[in-house]
């Protein structure tokens, strides 16, 4: 129980004024003081829900389904005091993502009746929970531009994308307000999980409200209006976008959506979310939005709106200043050489949805659907780095193995739990069997990296930034 939680009087007065009359303030405050239930989302790019359930049963993890996400679960573990959830082998291998249950709802809303996404934008994407959820929903097909304005958060976004085996993402690092002018009417699906005052995160962070003020709410609302206008300009006619926040006031939620109607009139339609999941109507507003107070579903506070663009809009004119794109599409000779060696050394192939691009000695696999956006803006990275060339061929990259390799690969080497711990600490390992050449390293039936046989040991190929210590699984 978070008895020392800080709830400003002005905040409570605001909630009292706007919360539906059938909800109780006493229950709201009591819910805010209860610790948040831990929740995860199974990464179906790496394993199915049924496969993960079997793993969980073997480890005596209790999984309770999240009603609005068929891959989401609240999790209870006996060993939670000794091994952190993020230090479990399953998490480190990308089999699941630690994600608050409410934050799974925006992507669920975006994917509903929207199975064939070709070009998507996640406008404010770090740390990557919704980006990886959307990529899994797209089955790594099409193209997903994941943008993050904060430079300090781009690194963790990149790390999570790689851990989860995402291959259809291009990362960008811009103020989201540029997209409407730079890429007008480009995306068929857009997620704007907007920066907000964070009123719904109290259960996770008891100090979340210490910097809150009515003035700060108004100030951040100005940014949100700019972002939602930019997103709407970037959306194709007929496309859908989801606007979401983890806050509770109307200024940052309903009012932002209504501002879009003020700006664009009949081009805007709000799509009702009352049938998104069982009992969704408990959080439904008159417009069809979901306004989730923490006591309704025993979760974080959240807001979700689904918006369809009915007709074209006139985007702002901008002048782009872009340097020369540093990559060149690989020619047929290069493609054959790379594909042949990849197959001969690791029995792997390039996904059909990706194509090879080369920059100096680097070989990258870009999503094919990104080709129309090459040269339209600058990218932090696109797709995944497959290899680096050297005098004896190609040096395959860890992130490529995490994206395309499976544990049943003929070249794989399965480690014991002791060896797997050594591996994650950056040390070479000595399995009982002996092989030769490069090998895909696995533990408990999941890919964890790439190594190379040197005598009777496997030389560790884990990137330095992924080396861990402490109490691992």
Curated annotation (Swiss-Prot):
List the NCBIfam families: nop2p, PRK11933.1
Which Gene3D superfamilies would you find in this protein's record?
3.10.450.720, Vaccinia Virus protein VP39 (3.40.50.150)
Uppermost EC category: transferase
Q: Which GO terms describe its molecular function?
A: RNA binding; rRNA (cytosine-C5-)-methyltransferase activity
Q: Which GO terms describe its cellular component?
A: cytoplasm
* A Pfam family: Methyltr_RsmB-F
Which InterPro entries does the annotation name?
Methyltr_RsmF_N, MeTrfase_RsmB-F_NOP2_cat, MeTrfase_RsmB-F_NOP2_dom, Nol1_Nop2_Fmu_2, Nop2p, RCMT, rRNA_ssu_MeTfrase_F, SAM-dependent_MTases_sf
Q: Which reaction does it catalyse?
A: cytidine(1407) in 16S rRNA + S-adenosyl-L-methionine = 5-methylcytidine(1407) in 16S rRNA + S-adenosyl-L-homocysteine + H(+)
Look up keyword Membrane and say if it applies: no
EC number(s) for this protein?
A: 2.1.1.178
Catalytic residue list: 246
**Family in the record:** Belongs to the class I-like SAM-binding methyltransferase superfamily. RsmB/NOP family.
Q: Carries keyword rRNA processing?
A: yes
Binding-site positions, S-adenosyl-L-methionine: 124-130, 148, 175, 193
Superkingdom of the source? Bacteria
* The protein, known as: Ribosomal RNA small subunit methyltransferase F
According to its UniProt entry, what is the function of this protein? Answer: Specifically methylates the cytosine at position 1407 (m5C1407) of 16S rRNA.
Keywords noted in UniProt: Cytoplasm, Methyltransferase, RNA-binding, rRNA processing, S-adenosyl-L-methionine, Transferase
Name any Gene Ontology BP term: rRNA base methylation
Cellular compartment(s): Cytoplasm
């Amino acid at each position: 129980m978070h008895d020392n939680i800080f709830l400003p009087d002005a905040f409570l007065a605001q909630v009292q004024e706007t919360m539906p009359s059938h909800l109780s303030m006493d229950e709201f405050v009591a819910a805010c003081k209860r610790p948040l239930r831990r929740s995860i989302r199974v990464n179906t790019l790496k394993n199915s829900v049924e496969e993960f359930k079997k793993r969980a049963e073997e480890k005596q993890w209790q999984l309770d389904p999240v009603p609005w996400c068929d891959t989401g679960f609240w999790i209870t573990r006996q060993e939670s005091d000794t091994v952190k959830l993020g230090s479990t082998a399953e998490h480190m291998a990308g089999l699941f993502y630690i994600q608050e249950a409410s934050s799974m709802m925006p992507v669920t809303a975006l994917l509903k009746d929207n199975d064939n996404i070709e070009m998507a934008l996640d406008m404010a994407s770090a740390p990557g929970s919704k980006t990886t959820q959307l990529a899994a929903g797209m089955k790594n097909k099409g193209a997903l531009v994941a943008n993050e304005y904060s430079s300090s958060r781009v690194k963790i976004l990149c790390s999570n994308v790689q851990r989860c085996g995402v291959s259809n993402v291009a990362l960008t690092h811009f103020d989201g307000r540029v997209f409407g002018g730079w890429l007008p009417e480009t995306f068929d699906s857009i997620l704007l999980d907007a920066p907000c005052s964070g009123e719904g995160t109290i259960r996770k962070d008891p100090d979340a409200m210490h910097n809150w003020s009515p003035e700060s709410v108004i100030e951040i609302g100005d940014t949100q209006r700019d972002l939602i206008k930019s997103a709407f300009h970037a959306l194709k006619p007929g496309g859908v976008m989801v606007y979401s926040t983890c806050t509770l006031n109307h200024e940052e939620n309903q009012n932002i959506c209504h501002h879009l109607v003020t700006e664009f009139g009949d081009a805007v339609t709000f799509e009702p979310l009352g049938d998104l999941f069982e009992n969704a109507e408990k959080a439904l507003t008159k417009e069809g939005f979901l306004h989730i107070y923490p006591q309704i579903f025993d979760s974080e506070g959240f807001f979700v709106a689904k918006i369809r663009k009915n007709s074209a809009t006139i985007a702002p004119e901008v002048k782009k200043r872009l340097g020369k794109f540093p990559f060149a599409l690989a020619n047929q000779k290069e493609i054959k050489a790379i594909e042949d060696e990849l197959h001969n050394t690791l029995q792997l192939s390039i996904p059909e949805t990706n194509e090879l691009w080369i920059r100096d000695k680097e070989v990258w696999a870009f999503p094919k659907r990104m080709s129309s956006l090459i040269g339209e803006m600058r990218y932090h990275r696109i797709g995944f780095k497959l290899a680096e060339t050297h005098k004896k061929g190609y040096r395959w990259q860890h992130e490529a193995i995490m994206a395309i390799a499976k544990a049943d690969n003929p070249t794989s080497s399965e480690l014991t739990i002791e060896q797997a711990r050594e591996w994650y600490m950056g040390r070479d390992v000595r399995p009982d069997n002996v092989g030769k050449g490069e090998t895909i390293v696995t533990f408990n039936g999941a890919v964890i990296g790439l190594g190379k046989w040197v005598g009777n040991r496997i030389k560790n190929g884990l990137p330095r930034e992924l080396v861990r210590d402490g109490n691992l699984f």
